[in-house]
Amino acid sequence: MADTYVGSIDQGTTGTRFMVFDHSGQVVANAYEKHEQIYPNPGWVEHDPIEIWENTKEVVTRGLEEAGLDAEQLEALGVTNQRETTIVWDEASGKPVHNALVWQDRRTTDRVEEIQEAGKVEMIREKTGLECDAYFSATKTEWILDNAEPLKMQASRGGDVRDRAEDGELLMGTIDSWLIQNLTGNHITDVTNASRTMLYNIRELEWDDELLEEFRVPRSMVPEVRPSSDDEYYGHTDADGFLGAEIPVAGALGDQQAAMFGQTCFDEGDAKNTYGTGSFYLMNTGTDAVASDHGLLTTIGFQMSGEPVQYALEGSIFVTGAAIEFLEDVDLINNAAQTAELASSVDSTDGVYMVPAFTGLGAPHWDGRARGTLVGMTRGTEKEHIVRATLESIGYQTRDVAEAMEADSGIETTSLRVDGGAVKNNFLCQLQSDILQTDIVRPVVDETTALGSAYAAGLAVGYWDTVDELRDNWQVDREFESEMDSADANTMYDRWDDAVERSLDWAQEE
């Protein structure tokens, strides 16, 4: 009998990855495809949902072929995804009425300020655990319903989009819903993705009528909410479809919650930080939805079938890896790997600070009008100083969140599990440890986002029996301990606060 595995579709901000894992959590197949980033106006970011679905089929097919696997060898499929990114589509045709509005998109900032001025921020925070921000799906959905021109997509029927939504003809969802719909024909999301819409009550665990009314989103549009690991399955792939097999789709988590699951942060106080386009620091708070007084989000960490929801505190940092991409865009570096060499060639930034607020600042500042700032330059400043300042900004932003996390939870983080593409950079990991004054632990399998959704799906179908098996799979690649004097780290961090102040409230209303 052929060996069996679990597959994971990891749909991210810049591309789509398909990975297959064996029982020990090791990677046996891996394929990736980038998709286009669409910038119609300053501060606007879109993706083409059709391109994402086509790429998904491509990477799944190619990943299996290159590894010499048959689809029938997959016991389950899990899905993980860039969160908050929002799609509205025609239920009958399955075609989107507009491009997806990406989590980074800031076009609804004015609407958010309207809500803030109306004094509704506290109500939203109490129900959803979220700051009222353009980051989340609620204002994105509202914008699409008010502004989409579906005929431009050459894919969906014309007619007033809002009227059609009110008539029950349109569906909305985050990327997981879009993929699950295309994989199984069912309109489903999981609790972690629902918790990022700003429409879902994380304490009552249901779509909130008051919020649906506030953002004028008809209840008929929203997906059914299910556990992250669901032994009743979300559905099966079509035997006559692109895979040619009926495979249970049984696990889904937003990418950051999936990384937490893949890092086996199953216990209260466990924390991880994922370094991607942005950085996302999550701490498991158990069955208690801890309210934040320090600009963090209260969110759902995960839910297993038949078990209570596990909550988390989250610090969402909008720009970390994207700051490295910026250095490439302006030709300061040729590729990301070059950053360590350039940054380590100087002892310090020589007083230069980079605040990479290209799309505003997330936790704990929440300023949609903050903008990227480079301060402290002199005629002696060289590109090496700017590159180092950019890497240091990742550490400072992480410390902003770590200090807020400790204040809210009362738990001191002595060890932080890290993952994501950037953690392959030893210099960056050491820098993080120095600035945070905390041990940084890098696991052997660093694609923990894909691993987390595979674990969720595999648990649902019995491929793994307990989370203890998953804990046994987790292995340390390297641990980084601080080599910097704490007084020096604190002095540098205090100066970072000054730099952040200069970036705030910069963008003017149009």
Swiss-Prot record:
GO cellular component: cytosol
Residues annotated to bind glycerol: R83, E84, Y135, D255, Q256
InterPro entries for this protein: ATPase_NBD, Carb_kinase_FGGY, Carb_kinase_FGGY_CS, FGGY_C, FGGY_N, Glycerol_kin
Keyword field: ATP-binding, Glycerol metabolism, Kinase, Nucleotide-binding, Transferase
Record-linked Gene3D superfamilies: 3.30.420.40
GO biological-process terms attached to the record: glycerol catabolic process; glycerol metabolic process; glycerol-3-phosphate metabolic process
Functional note: Key enzyme in the regulation of glycerol uptake and metabolism. Catalyzes the phosphorylation of glycerol to yield sn-glycerol 3-phosphate.
Binding residue positions for ATP: T13, T14, T277, G321, G421
Binding site for ADP: T13, R17, T277, G321, G421, N425
Pathway: Polyol metabolism; glycerol degradation via glycerol kinase pathway; sn-glycerol 3-phosphate from glycerol: step 1/1
GN (gene name): glpK
Lineage of origin: Archaea, Methanobacteriati, Methanobacteriota, Stenosarchaea group, Halobacteria
Class of this enzyme: transferase
Entries under SUPFAM superfamilies matching the protein: Actin-like ATPase domain (SSF53067)
PROSITE patterns: FGGY_KINASES_2
Protein name per UniProt: Glycerol kinase
